[in-house]
């Protein structure tokens, strides 16, 4: 099933990622040996670990832009005494010219950690291993040969598995842990969970799994029985050991027939969707953290001024309460997280957001809002993880 989904991703990537591929097309290099194991006892093999000045020790202060245009500051800080851990696997961003990345972080890898993961350090101890992921150049090479990147097989998977096992043996000490991934990171985590966690003793330590920008199958009318045997979807913020998953699309640009996400080939299965703004169902307000300057996980977008007065915003992120709402939806092509922008064109605050994947001036509708999947719901996830942590610790005391 995952292979069929990924085949669709590859076919459309040639168009959607064309500007990025152009950067690497003439610079592909021979792949260094990936036969050796990465030494995860070496701190350099981790982008983030607790108590360090590293990729998670960054400025995440935010300007809150109210609907009336008023600006207020929101300070951010990590919690060095967080009672649980988070383990994060990042998406395809490496600009290395080889099919798989090396173990030296490039600016894109540092950027995506800041964008998607560092903020979780306010709720959990952060663990983010580097891994020899399939690069943008490697994805392009797969397109040329007509193949599908084997996200779940090879050095990229082996590295994450080894990092996870090192973490369990040397760092976890029986603590609860949240798994967090996006895109390639989610595909790898899915395989890790299927092979190493689901239905095994370590499953009891999973507070939850946040798997975004991917597709998870569940049996129709049920929360399990597809991708996972015994890890259900989350339906409440105090539920633990469960999975949250979505792929986001604008309400005005729903998944087309060739969508990359939100559909599964098996007739008795459906693609899962959990809305972090309303886990129990229905619509709810998103607590998004968006880049002030339009910085995305790959590339940049040019945002509109955040206020009609053009006030200077000096923080790297903005929050826009009330602008965005989300609801799980299904059309004839997919099940997805429908993002509604509640902008007022004549109002003092910005009335739209950036984040569509573009090829030139053309929106790639089949990708949805893949580039900001995490940004859209990260504030909601922080609240959920906080509530889940209390529930998990209460169960552990029994």
Give a label for each model feature.
Residues 89, 180-182, 209-213:
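Short His-Asn-centered micro-motif
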Residues 1-4:
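Positively charged n-region of N-terminal signal peptides that target proteins for export
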Residues 26, 77-78:
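Sequence/structural signature of beta-propeller domains
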Residues 181-185, 189:
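Gly/Ala-rich beta-loop-alpha elbow adjacent to hydrolase catalytic centers
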Residues 13-23:
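C-terminal segment of classical bacterial N-terminal signal peptides
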Residues 44, 50-52, 78-82, 88-176, ...:
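Active-site catalytic motif of lipid deacylating hydrolases and related acyltransferases
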Residues 28-74:
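N-terminal module-boundary/linker segments of secreted carbohydrate-active enzymes
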Residues 154-173, 194-359, 391, 395:
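Surface cap/lid and interfacial helix-loop subdomains adjacent to catalytic sites
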């Amino acid at each position: 099933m995952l292979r069929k989904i990924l085949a669709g991703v590859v076919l459309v990537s040639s168009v959607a990622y064309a500007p990025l591929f152009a950067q690497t097309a003439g610079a592909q290099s021979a792949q260094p040996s990936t036969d050796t194991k990465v030494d995860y006892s070496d701190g350099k093999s981790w982008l983030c670990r607790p108590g360090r000045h590293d990729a998670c020790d960054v400025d995440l202060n935010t300007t809150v832009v109210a609907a009336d245009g008023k600006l207020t500051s929101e300070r951010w800080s990590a919690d060095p005494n967080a009672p649980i851990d988070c383990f994060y696997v990042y998406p395809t961003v490496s600009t290395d010219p080889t099919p798989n990345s090396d173990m030296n972080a490039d600016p894109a890898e540092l950027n995506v950690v800041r964008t998607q993961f560092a903020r979780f350090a306010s709720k959990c101890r952060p663990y983010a291993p580097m891994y020899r992921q399939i690069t943008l150049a490697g994805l392009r090479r797969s397109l040329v040969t007509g193949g599908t990147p084997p996200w779940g097989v090879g050095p990229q998977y082996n590295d994450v598995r080894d990092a996870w096992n090192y973490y369990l043996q040397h760092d976890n000490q029986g603590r609860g842990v949240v798994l967090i991934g996006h895109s390639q990171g989610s595909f790898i985590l899915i395989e890790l969970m299927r092979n190493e966690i689901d239905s095994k003793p370590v499953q009891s330590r999973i507070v939850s799994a946040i798997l975004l920008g991917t597709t998870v199958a569940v049996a129709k009318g049920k929360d399990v029985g597809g991708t996972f045997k015994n890890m259900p979807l989350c339906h409440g913020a105090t539920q633990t050991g469960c999975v949250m998953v979505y792929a986001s699309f604008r309400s005005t640009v729903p998944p087309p027939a060739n969508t990359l996400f939100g559909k599964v080939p098996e007739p008795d299965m459906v693609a899962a969707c959990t809305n972090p703004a309303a886990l129990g169902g229905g619509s709810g307000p998103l607590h998004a953290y968006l880049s002030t300057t339009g910085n995305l996980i790959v590339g940049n977008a040019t945002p509109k001024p955040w206020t009609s007065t053009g006030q200077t915003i000096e923080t790297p992120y903005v929050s826009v309460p009330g602008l965005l709402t989300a609801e799980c939806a299904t059309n004839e092509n997919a099940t997805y997280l429908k993002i509604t922008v509640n902008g007022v064109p004549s109002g003092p605050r910005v009335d739209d957001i950036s984040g569509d994947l573009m090829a030139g001036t053309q929106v790639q509708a089949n990708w949805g809002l893949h580039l900001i999947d995490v940004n859209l719901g990260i504030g909601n996830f922080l609240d959920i993880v906080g509530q889940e942590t209390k529930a998990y610790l209460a169960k552990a005391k029994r």
